[in-house]
Amino acid sequence: MAHKRSHKSPSNRQRFVARVGISGSYGGMNLGDEAILQAMIAQLRASRPVELTVFTADVGDTLKRHGVEAALPVRDLTRDEARQAVAQLDLLILGGGGILYDAGADAYLREVTLAREVGVPVMVYAISAGPLEDERIRKLVRETLDNVDVLTVRDRQGKRVLEDIGVERDIVVTADPAVLLEPQPLTEDRLRQAGIAEGKRIIAFSVREPGPAAPDIDVEHYHLLLAHAADFVIDRLEADVIFVPMEREHRDLQHSHAVVAKMRRAQRATVLKEEYTSGEVLALLGHCEFAIGMRLHFLIFAALQGVPFAPLPYASKVAGFIESVGMGTPVLKDVSAGTLLAMIDRSWDYREKLRHHITSTIGEVQGQARKNNELAVQLLDRIAGEKARTGAVR
Protein backbone atom coordinates (compact mmCIF):
# COMPACT_ATOMS: atom_id res chain seq x y z
CA MET A 1 0.00 0.00 0.00
CA ALA A 2 2.78 2.42 0.89
CA HIS A 3 6.42 2.58 -0.13
CA LYS A 4 8.99 1.70 2.52
CA ARG A 5 11.84 4.04 3.41
CA SER A 6 15.19 3.32 5.00
CA HIS A 7 16.53 5.18 8.04
CA LYS A 8 20.05 4.89 9.43
CA SER A 9 19.36 5.73 13.08
CA PRO A 10 20.22 2.87 15.43
CA SER A 11 17.21 3.25 17.74
CA ASN A 12 14.19 1.04 17.28
CA ARG A 13 11.91 4.04 17.45
CA GLN A 14 13.70 5.81 14.61
CA ARG A 15 14.07 2.64 12.50
CA PHE A 16 10.34 2.05 12.72
CA VAL A 17 8.52 3.57 9.75
CA ALA A 18 4.92 3.81 10.88
CA ARG A 19 2.15 3.17 8.38
CA VAL A 20 -0.38 5.83 9.31
CA GLY A 21 -3.84 6.15 7.80
CA ILE A 22 -5.74 9.44 7.93
CA SER A 23 -9.50 9.43 7.47
CA GLY A 24 -11.48 12.66 7.19
CA SER A 25 -13.29 15.02 4.84
CA TYR A 26 -10.57 15.14 2.20
CA GLY A 27 -10.43 15.31 -1.57
CA GLY A 28 -10.25 19.00 -2.47
CA MET A 29 -13.85 19.80 -1.62
CA ASN A 30 -13.09 22.21 1.22
CA LEU A 31 -9.98 24.36 1.57
CA GLY A 32 -10.31 24.34 5.35
CA ASP A 33 -10.15 20.55 5.50
CA GLU A 34 -7.19 20.55 3.11
CA ALA A 35 -5.44 23.08 5.37
CA ILE A 36 -5.95 20.71 8.29
CA LEU A 37 -4.49 17.78 6.37
CA GLN A 38 -1.54 19.83 5.12
CA ALA A 39 -0.68 20.95 8.66
CA MET A 40 -1.07 17.42 10.05
CA ILE A 41 1.20 15.93 7.41
CA ALA A 42 3.88 18.57 7.92
CA GLN A 43 3.96 17.98 11.67
CA LEU A 44 3.97 14.18 11.43
CA ARG A 45 6.75 14.12 8.84
CA ALA A 46 8.82 16.56 10.91
CA SER A 47 8.46 14.36 13.99
CA ARG A 48 8.78 10.72 12.91
CA PRO A 49 9.35 8.64 9.75
CA VAL A 50 5.88 7.76 8.44
CA GLU A 51 4.21 6.33 5.36
CA LEU A 52 0.85 8.04 4.93
CA THR A 53 -2.35 6.69 3.43
CA VAL A 54 -5.29 9.09 3.16
CA PHE A 55 -8.88 7.91 2.84
CA THR A 56 -10.27 10.50 0.45
CA ALA A 57 -13.14 11.41 -1.86
CA ASP A 58 -10.67 12.22 -4.68
CA VAL A 59 -7.53 10.12 -4.91
CA GLY A 60 -5.94 12.20 -7.66
CA ASP A 61 -6.46 15.49 -5.86
CA THR A 62 -5.05 14.18 -2.58
CA LEU A 63 -1.95 12.64 -4.19
CA LYS A 64 -1.26 15.82 -6.16
CA ARG A 65 -2.04 18.26 -3.36
CA HIS A 66 -0.32 16.49 -0.47
CA GLY A 67 2.27 14.09 -1.91
CA VAL A 68 1.33 11.22 0.38
CA GLU A 69 2.45 7.65 -0.30
CA ALA A 70 -1.06 6.35 -0.95
CA ALA A 71 -4.67 7.47 -1.19
CA LEU A 72 -7.81 5.34 -1.18
CA PRO A 73 -11.27 6.20 -2.59
CA VAL A 74 -13.15 5.96 0.69
CA ARG A 75 -16.60 6.40 -0.85
CA ASP A 76 -16.05 3.51 -3.27
CA LEU A 77 -14.56 0.99 -0.85
CA THR A 78 -16.72 -1.87 0.36
CA ARG A 79 -16.58 -2.64 4.06
CA ASP A 80 -14.33 -5.65 3.41
CA GLU A 81 -12.00 -3.58 1.21
CA ALA A 82 -11.81 -0.86 3.83
CA ARG A 83 -11.13 -3.44 6.56
CA GLN A 84 -8.25 -4.92 4.54
CA ALA A 85 -6.76 -1.46 4.02
CA VAL A 86 -7.06 -0.53 7.69
CA ALA A 87 -5.53 -3.85 8.76
CA GLN A 88 -2.28 -2.88 6.97
CA LEU A 89 -1.84 0.20 9.18
CA ASP A 90 0.07 0.74 12.41
CA LEU A 91 -2.15 3.67 13.37
CA LEU A 92 -5.41 5.15 12.11
CA ILE A 93 -6.08 8.85 12.65
CA LEU A 94 -9.65 10.13 12.39
CA GLY A 95 -9.59 13.80 11.53
CA GLY A 96 -8.25 16.26 11.89
CA GLY A 97 -11.23 18.43 12.15
CA GLY A 98 -14.61 17.29 10.96
CA ILE A 99 -17.84 17.21 12.93
CA LEU A 100 -19.55 14.25 14.53
CA TYR A 101 -23.24 14.96 14.07
CA ASP A 102 -26.38 12.89 13.59
CA ALA A 103 -26.49 12.81 9.79
CA GLY A 104 -22.83 11.98 9.16
CA ALA A 105 -21.61 9.91 12.10
CA ASP A 106 -22.17 6.43 10.62
CA ALA A 107 -19.95 7.05 7.60
CA TYR A 108 -17.43 9.17 9.50
CA LEU A 109 -16.79 6.45 12.09
CA ARG A 110 -16.66 3.45 9.73
CA GLU A 111 -12.88 3.20 9.49
CA VAL A 112 -12.56 3.65 13.27
CA THR A 113 -14.94 0.76 13.85
CA LEU A 114 -12.97 -1.39 11.41
CA ALA A 115 -9.68 -0.46 13.09
CA ARG A 116 -10.98 -1.67 16.42
CA GLU A 117 -12.13 -4.92 14.79
CA VAL A 118 -8.64 -5.66 13.44
CA GLY A 119 -6.69 -4.37 16.44
CA VAL A 120 -5.22 -1.20 14.92
CA PRO A 121 -4.70 1.70 17.37
CA VAL A 122 -6.81 4.81 16.74
CA MET A 123 -6.36 8.50 17.46
CA VAL A 124 -9.33 10.83 17.04
CA TYR A 125 -7.64 14.11 16.11
CA ALA A 126 -9.15 17.55 16.84
CA ILE A 127 -12.76 16.86 15.91
CA SER A 128 -15.90 18.85 16.74
CA ALA A 129 -19.20 17.33 17.86
CA GLY A 130 -22.91 18.11 17.69
CA PRO A 131 -25.74 18.16 17.28
CA LEU A 132 -26.13 14.57 18.51
CA GLU A 133 -29.81 14.03 19.24
CA ASP A 134 -30.51 10.61 17.70
CA GLU A 135 -30.21 7.96 20.43
CA ARG A 136 -28.80 5.33 18.07
CA ILE A 137 -26.09 7.72 16.89
CA ARG A 138 -25.33 8.83 20.45
CA LYS A 139 -24.81 5.19 21.42
CA LEU A 140 -22.60 4.56 18.36
CA VAL A 141 -20.44 7.61 19.08
CA ARG A 142 -20.20 6.82 22.79
CA GLU A 143 -19.19 3.18 22.31
CA THR A 144 -16.78 3.95 19.47
CA LEU A 145 -14.94 6.82 21.13
CA ASP A 146 -14.67 5.08 24.49
CA ASN A 147 -12.49 2.47 22.76
CA VAL A 148 -10.01 4.70 20.91
CA ASP A 149 -6.47 5.24 22.17
CA VAL A 150 -6.36 9.05 22.06
CA LEU A 151 -9.24 11.51 21.73
CA THR A 152 -8.80 15.23 21.14
CA VAL A 153 -11.40 17.86 20.27
CA ARG A 154 -10.75 21.30 18.85
CA ASP A 155 -13.21 23.21 21.06
CA ARG A 156 -14.71 23.07 24.54
CA GLN A 157 -18.21 22.72 23.14
CA GLY A 158 -17.19 19.46 21.47
CA LYS A 159 -15.98 18.11 24.80
CA ARG A 160 -19.24 19.14 26.48
CA VAL A 161 -21.31 17.39 23.78
CA LEU A 162 -19.31 14.16 24.06
CA GLU A 163 -19.46 14.21 27.85
CA ASP A 164 -23.22 14.82 27.70
CA ILE A 165 -23.78 11.69 25.59
CA GLY A 166 -21.76 9.62 28.05
CA VAL A 167 -18.24 9.35 26.61
CA GLU A 168 -16.12 8.36 29.61
CA ARG A 169 -12.56 8.25 28.30
CA ASP A 170 -10.23 11.26 28.61
CA ILE A 171 -11.06 14.03 26.14
CA VAL A 172 -8.26 16.53 25.50
CA VAL A 173 -9.23 19.99 24.26
CA THR A 174 -6.70 21.21 21.70
CA ALA A 175 -7.26 23.48 18.69
CA ASP A 176 -7.81 23.26 14.96
CA PRO A 177 -4.63 22.05 13.19
CA ALA A 178 -5.15 24.62 10.41
CA VAL A 179 -3.87 27.38 12.71
CA LEU A 180 -0.40 25.96 11.94
CA LEU A 181 -0.70 26.45 8.17
CA GLU A 182 1.92 28.57 6.40
CA PRO A 183 0.93 31.05 3.63
CA GLN A 184 1.79 30.38 -0.01
CA PRO A 185 2.50 33.76 -1.65
CA LEU A 186 0.60 34.85 -4.77
CA THR A 187 2.09 36.59 -7.79
CA GLU A 188 1.08 40.17 -8.58
CA ASP A 189 -0.86 38.92 -11.61
CA ARG A 190 -2.92 36.53 -9.50
CA LEU A 191 -3.58 39.24 -6.92
CA ARG A 192 -4.85 41.55 -9.66
CA GLN A 193 -7.08 38.76 -10.98
CA ALA A 194 -8.55 38.53 -7.48
CA GLY A 195 -9.35 42.24 -7.51
CA ILE A 196 -6.49 43.17 -5.19
CA ALA A 197 -4.25 46.06 -6.18
CA GLU A 198 -2.02 48.50 -4.34
CA GLY A 199 -3.98 51.43 -2.96
CA LYS A 200 -7.32 49.60 -2.87
CA ARG A 201 -9.00 48.91 0.45
CA ILE A 202 -10.27 45.32 0.34
CA ILE A 203 -12.80 43.72 2.67
CA ALA A 204 -13.16 39.93 2.41
CA PHE A 205 -16.45 38.05 2.81
CA SER A 206 -17.18 34.36 3.33
CA VAL A 207 -20.54 32.75 2.52
CA ARG A 208 -21.52 29.11 2.98
CA GLU A 209 -24.37 26.90 1.85
CA PRO A 210 -27.06 25.57 4.19
CA GLY A 211 -26.82 21.91 5.07
CA PRO A 212 -26.70 19.32 7.88
CA ALA A 213 -23.78 21.08 9.58
CA ALA A 214 -25.66 24.40 9.48
CA PRO A 215 -29.30 23.48 10.20
CA ASP A 216 -30.29 26.92 11.51
CA ILE A 217 -29.35 28.87 8.40
CA ASP A 218 -32.22 30.71 6.73
CA VAL A 219 -30.95 31.37 3.22
CA GLU A 220 -33.01 34.48 2.49
CA HIS A 221 -32.11 35.96 5.88
CA TYR A 222 -28.37 35.55 5.59
CA HIS A 223 -28.20 36.53 1.90
CA LEU A 224 -29.88 39.85 2.70
CA LEU A 225 -27.79 40.22 5.84
CA LEU A 226 -24.51 39.89 3.98
CA ALA A 227 -25.69 42.00 1.04
CA HIS A 228 -26.50 44.84 3.47
CA ALA A 229 -23.13 44.35 5.15
CA ALA A 230 -21.26 44.45 1.83
CA ASP A 231 -23.05 47.63 0.73
CA PHE A 232 -22.35 49.15 4.12
CA VAL A 233 -18.59 48.57 4.05
CA ILE A 234 -18.36 49.81 0.46
CA ASP A 235 -20.03 53.09 1.44
CA ARG A 236 -18.78 53.50 4.99
CA LEU A 237 -15.19 52.38 4.42
CA GLU A 238 -14.79 53.36 0.75
CA ALA A 239 -13.76 49.78 0.06
CA ASP A 240 -14.13 47.05 -2.51
CA VAL A 241 -15.28 43.61 -1.40
CA ILE A 242 -14.21 40.12 -2.44
CA PHE A 243 -16.12 36.92 -1.76
CA VAL A 244 -13.86 33.97 -0.95
CA PRO A 245 -15.37 30.52 -1.69
CA MET A 246 -13.93 27.87 0.62
CA GLU A 247 -16.05 25.03 -0.81
CA ARG A 248 -16.47 25.14 -4.55
CA GLU A 249 -18.30 21.84 -4.96
CA HIS A 250 -20.85 22.72 -2.30
CA ARG A 251 -22.14 25.94 -3.80
CA ASP A 252 -20.15 28.61 -1.97
CA LEU A 253 -19.76 30.19 -5.40
CA GLN A 254 -23.49 30.17 -6.10
CA HIS A 255 -24.33 31.57 -2.68
CA SER A 256 -21.70 34.29 -3.06
CA HIS A 257 -23.26 35.33 -6.37
CA ALA A 258 -26.71 35.24 -4.76
CA VAL A 259 -25.52 37.73 -2.14
CA VAL A 260 -23.98 39.97 -4.80
CA ALA A 261 -27.29 39.91 -6.71
CA LYS A 262 -28.99 41.50 -3.70
CA MET A 263 -26.40 44.27 -3.31
CA ARG A 264 -26.95 47.90 -4.37
CA ARG A 265 -23.22 48.32 -5.03
CA ALA A 266 -22.62 45.03 -6.82
CA GLN A 267 -20.17 46.66 -9.24
CA ARG A 268 -17.72 46.97 -6.32
CA ALA A 269 -17.86 43.24 -5.51
CA THR A 270 -15.73 40.39 -6.88
CA VAL A 271 -16.37 36.68 -6.43
CA LEU A 272 -13.12 34.72 -6.65
CA LYS A 273 -13.38 32.23 -9.50
CA GLU A 274 -9.82 30.88 -9.78
CA GLU A 275 -8.66 27.71 -8.07
CA TYR A 276 -6.59 28.42 -4.96
CA THR A 277 -4.74 26.25 -2.49
CA SER A 278 -5.36 26.69 1.22
CA GLY A 279 -2.01 28.44 1.60
CA GLU A 280 -2.83 30.82 -1.25
CA VAL A 281 -6.13 31.83 0.34
CA LEU A 282 -4.25 32.38 3.59
CA ALA A 283 -1.80 34.64 1.74
CA LEU A 284 -4.60 36.44 -0.08
CA LEU A 285 -6.34 37.37 3.17
CA GLY A 286 -3.13 39.05 4.27
CA HIS A 287 -3.85 41.70 1.61
CA CYS A 288 -7.27 42.52 3.11
CA GLU A 289 -7.99 45.08 5.81
CA PHE A 290 -11.03 43.41 7.33
CA ALA A 291 -12.96 40.13 7.03
CA ILE A 292 -16.62 39.28 7.56
CA GLY A 293 -17.75 35.72 7.33
CA MET A 294 -19.25 32.42 8.21
CA ARG A 295 -16.76 29.67 7.39
CA LEU A 296 -14.47 28.58 10.18
CA HIS A 297 -11.24 28.41 8.23
CA PHE A 298 -11.84 31.73 6.52
CA LEU A 299 -11.88 33.25 10.01
CA ILE A 300 -8.86 31.19 11.08
CA PHE A 301 -6.92 32.40 8.03
CA ALA A 302 -7.86 36.01 8.83
CA ALA A 303 -6.64 35.56 12.40
CA LEU A 304 -3.36 34.02 11.23
CA GLN A 305 -2.74 37.10 9.09
CA GLY A 306 -3.68 39.48 11.89
CA VAL A 307 -6.70 40.72 9.94
CA PRO A 308 -9.55 41.98 12.17
CA PHE A 309 -12.80 40.16 11.49
CA ALA A 310 -16.51 40.10 12.28
CA PRO A 311 -17.68 36.47 12.59
CA LEU A 312 -21.11 35.03 11.87
CA PRO A 313 -21.11 31.69 13.73
CA TYR A 314 -23.47 29.08 12.28
CA ALA A 315 -22.17 26.05 14.20
CA SER A 316 -20.42 25.16 17.45
CA LYS A 317 -17.03 24.73 15.76
CA VAL A 318 -17.09 28.38 14.64
CA ALA A 319 -18.25 29.61 18.03
CA GLY A 320 -15.53 27.48 19.61
CA PHE A 321 -12.76 29.17 17.63
CA ILE A 322 -14.19 32.62 18.34
CA GLU A 323 -14.18 31.74 22.03
CA SER A 324 -10.57 30.50 21.83
CA VAL A 325 -9.35 33.90 20.63
CA GLY A 326 -11.37 35.68 23.31
CA MET A 327 -14.08 37.15 21.12
CA GLY A 328 -17.84 36.98 21.55
CA THR A 329 -20.63 37.31 19.02
CA PRO A 330 -24.27 36.25 18.66
CA VAL A 331 -25.13 33.23 16.54
CA LEU A 332 -26.15 33.88 12.94
CA LYS A 333 -29.87 33.22 13.36
CA ASP A 334 -30.06 35.89 16.08
CA VAL A 335 -28.32 38.62 14.05
CA SER A 336 -30.35 41.40 12.43
CA ALA A 337 -29.03 43.77 9.77
CA GLY A 338 -28.83 46.56 12.32
CA THR A 339 -26.95 44.37 14.79
CA LEU A 340 -24.46 43.24 12.17
CA LEU A 341 -23.81 46.71 10.77
CA ALA A 342 -23.29 48.08 14.27
CA MET A 343 -20.87 45.22 15.03
CA ILE A 344 -18.93 45.88 11.82
CA ASP A 345 -18.87 49.62 12.47
CA ARG A 346 -17.62 49.16 16.02
CA SER A 347 -15.07 46.52 15.00
CA TRP A 348 -13.72 48.76 12.26
CA ASP A 349 -13.35 51.72 14.61
CA TYR A 350 -11.44 49.52 17.05
CA ARG A 351 -9.66 47.47 14.41
CA GLU A 352 -6.14 48.12 15.66
CA LYS A 353 -7.11 47.07 19.16
CA LEU A 354 -8.86 44.03 17.69
CA ARG A 355 -5.81 43.23 15.56
CA HIS A 356 -3.56 43.39 18.61
CA HIS A 357 -5.92 41.15 20.56
CA ILE A 358 -6.03 38.54 17.78
CA THR A 359 -2.27 38.49 17.23
CA SER A 360 -1.61 38.25 20.97
CA THR A 361 -3.94 35.26 21.43
CA ILE A 362 -3.36 33.25 18.25
CA GLY A 363 0.04 32.04 19.49
CA GLU A 364 -1.63 30.34 22.45
CA VAL A 365 -4.16 28.73 20.11
CA GLN A 366 -1.29 27.45 17.94
CA GLY A 367 0.32 25.96 21.03
CA GLN A 368 -2.91 24.13 21.77
CA ALA A 369 -3.00 22.85 18.18
CA ARG A 370 0.53 21.43 18.51
CA LYS A 371 -0.71 19.20 21.32
CA ASN A 372 -2.47 17.09 18.71
CA ASN A 373 0.80 16.10 17.08
CA GLU A 374 2.54 15.68 20.42
CA LEU A 375 -0.09 13.13 21.44
CA ALA A 376 0.12 11.43 18.04
CA VAL A 377 3.91 11.12 18.39
CA GLN A 378 3.57 9.69 21.91
CA LEU A 379 1.18 7.09 20.53
CA LEU A 380 3.51 6.29 17.62
CA ASP A 381 6.42 5.84 20.02
CA ARG A 382 4.33 3.49 22.14
CA ILE A 383 3.43 1.50 19.02
CA ALA A 384 7.11 1.42 17.98
CA GLY A 385 8.08 0.12 21.41
CA GLU A 386 5.50 -2.65 21.23
CA LYS A 387 6.69 -3.59 17.74
CA ALA A 388 10.29 -3.70 18.96
CA ARG A 389 9.39 -5.97 21.88
CA THR A 390 7.64 -8.40 19.55
CA GLY A 391 10.33 -8.20 16.86
CA ALA A 392 7.90 -6.69 14.37
CA VAL A 393 9.87 -3.53 13.52
CA ARG A 394 10.31 -3.30 9.75
Identify the meaning behind each predicted range.
Residues A2-R394:
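Active-site anion-handling motifs in enzyme catalytic cores
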